[in-house]
Amino acid sequence: MKVTLPEFERAGVMVVGDVMLDRYWYGPSSRISPEAPVPVVKVNTIEERPGGAANVAMNIASLGANARLVGLTGIDDAARALSKSLADVNVKCDFVSVPTHPTITKLRVLSRNQQLIRLDFEEGFEGVDPQPLHERINQALSSIGALVLSDYAKGALASVQQMIQLARKAGVPVLIDPKGTDFERYRGATLLTPNLSEFEAVVGKCKTEEEIVERGMKLIADYELSALLVTRSEQGMSLLQPGKAPLHMPTQAQEVYDVTGAGDTVIGVLAATLAAGNSLEEACFFANAAAGVVVGKLGTSTVSPIELENAVRGRADTGFGVMTEEELKLAVVAARKRGEKVVMTNGVFDILHAGHVSYLANARKLGDRLIVAVNSDASTKRLKGDSRPVNPLEQRMIVLGALEAVDWVVSFEEDTPQRLIAGILPDLLVKGGDYKPEEIAGSKEVWANGGEVLVLNFEDGCSTTNIIKKIQQDKKG
């Protein structure tokens, strides 16, 4: 199955926050100044790049989405340089000019790949009238699918609570990359995206994944958030939502050269994907893939649609993710050459719940690789009735592929996966429920090949059918 990228071209996103200009002076250094014990750098290259909230907007525009940027600047060369750089990459700027303040600028001097000094030109915009920012947000709300608030604690988001309320009143999701430990100011946001250090600065040190989930869910409740995404560097990212099982996604980075701006890429891809009409789980899947690309580049960078598609589909080359049947067979051959035990299971997995997550985690513990075969939409309809599936095949596979326990996801069109299992011949075939092993599709073929068949219990009280019934009852009530 081909994973389709979101329709970014129809996504409109506004970014509001602290914009800044990053300046870089490069050159060789071979002597010490006679005036002071400091190196002399002969500057031969000068670069200017949009930073802060401007980098978020660039990440959104690089995907082909419609990006609008609002922020505070001075009336100076830095503001003009920002406007030109952003216009060149199709970011529509609507800056509020503050004559009494300079545009925030960070100048870095580098030699031999080492940063020697950073000079900051800023006064902060605290106390500046926020009304022009509110007016720009109000004017855009009817034409955007997401609002990003990018906080670098420079003053542009001093009235962040009013901005959140404006967007929520209009039904526009609000995504915030937080700064500092006062999360009270972000109350009512749709999604916060702190990194692990920022998260632990608020909730305390977390020794286990369970503690991250427990404290994250409390934070969601305390501040009336809809969701929380904790980015965890080499450990990937964790999505927490009330009433849903936590979604832990392992990192997809192959090599890490520079984490600068990775958070901007994550929130930019999240916003663009949501604005394109995709689910939050799908948005996290694509954001995780994009982060894996951007940390492999030097400096603040963006991700193109081609790079993102290669990152998603490229997992097949490294033995992971959503695959075609042919790709899966090659991956299994490679796994067996490495001496790995292959476990396989199957199901509809329509509305993923805690029972599914627990079952798949237990299945994964039985071997080195876990294959999940998923009924196609037509197969599901024949099995479950005309009202199913609730979620289409592509969405079901993407969410499964994002789970840490799952290595490979493949679909099948038939009523049972018997043909598929016979072609893969896993070392262990697993099924959840009250089946007898001989009743499980593909069991005879696996046994004939010397493999094992095992039945695992599902977690009590978890059922897609019950979830659907509860939703229907809540609507009636």
Curated annotation (Swiss-Prot):
Q: Which GO terms describe its cellular component?
A: cytosol
* Record's keyword terms, sorted: Acetylation, ATP-binding, Carbohydrate metabolism, Kinase, Lipopolysaccharide biosynthesis, Multifunctional enzyme, Nucleotide-binding, Nucleotidyltransferase, Transferase
Annotated region Ribokinase: the residues are 1-318
Which CDD domains does this UniProt record tie to the protein? RfaE_like
Chain residue ranges for the region called Cytidylyltransferase: 344-477
Q: Which InterPro entries match?
A: Bifunc_HldE, Carboh/pur_kinase_PfkB_CS, Cyt_trans-like, PfkB_dom, RfaE_dom_I, RfaE_dom_II, Ribokinase-like, Rossmann-like_a/b/a_fold
Please give the residue positions where the record annotates the modification N6-acetyllysine. 179
Q: Which reaction does it catalyse?
A: D-glycero-beta-D-manno-heptose 7-phosphate + ATP = D-glycero-beta-D-manno-heptose 1,7-bisphosphate + ADP + H(+); D-glycero-beta-D-manno-heptose 1-phosphate + ATP + H(+) = ADP-D-glycero-beta-D-manno-heptose + diphosphate
Broadest EC class assigned to this enzyme: transferase
Q: Which GO terms describe its molecular function?
A: ATP binding; heptose 7-phosphate kinase activity; heptose-1-phosphate adenylyltransferase activity; phosphotransferase activity, alcohol group as acceptor
Which Pfam families does the record cross-reference, listed alphabetically?
CTP_transf_like, PfkB
Known pathway: Nucleotide-sugar biosynthesis; ADP-L-glycero-beta-D-manno-heptose biosynthesis; ADP-L-glycero-beta-D-manno-heptose from D-glycero-beta-D-manno-heptose 7-phosphate: step 1/4; Nucleotide-sugar biosynthesis; ADP-L-glycero-beta-D-manno-heptose biosynthesis; ADP-L-glycero-beta-D-manno-heptose from D-glycero-beta-D-manno-heptose 7-phosphate: step 3/4; Bacterial outer membrane biogenesis; LPS core biosynthesis
Q: Which domain of life is it from?
A: Bacteria
Q: Which GO terms describe its biological process?
A: ADP-L-glycero-beta-D-manno-heptose biosynthetic process; lipopolysaccharide core region biosynthetic process
* Documented EC number(s): 2.7.1.167, 2.7.7.70
Q: Where does ATP bind?
A: 195-198
Q: Which Gene3D superfamilies match?
A: 3.40.1190.20, HUPs
- SUPFAM superfamilies, per database record: Nucleotidylyl transferase, Ribokinase-like
Which residues are responsible for catalysis?
Answer: 264
Alphabetical list of NCBIfam families matching this protein: cyt_tran_rel, PRK11316.1, rfaE_dom_I, rfaE_dom_II
Summarize the protein's role. Catalyzes the ADP transfer from ATP to D-glycero-beta-D-manno-heptose 1-phosphate, yielding ADP-D-glycero-beta-D-manno-heptose.
| Complexes and interactors | Homodimer.
Task: Name the protein family.
Answer: In the N-terminal section; belongs to the carbohydrate kinase PfkB family. In the C-terminal section; belongs to the cytidylyltransferase family.
- State what protein this is by name: Bifunctional protein HldE
Species source reads Escherichia coli O157:H7
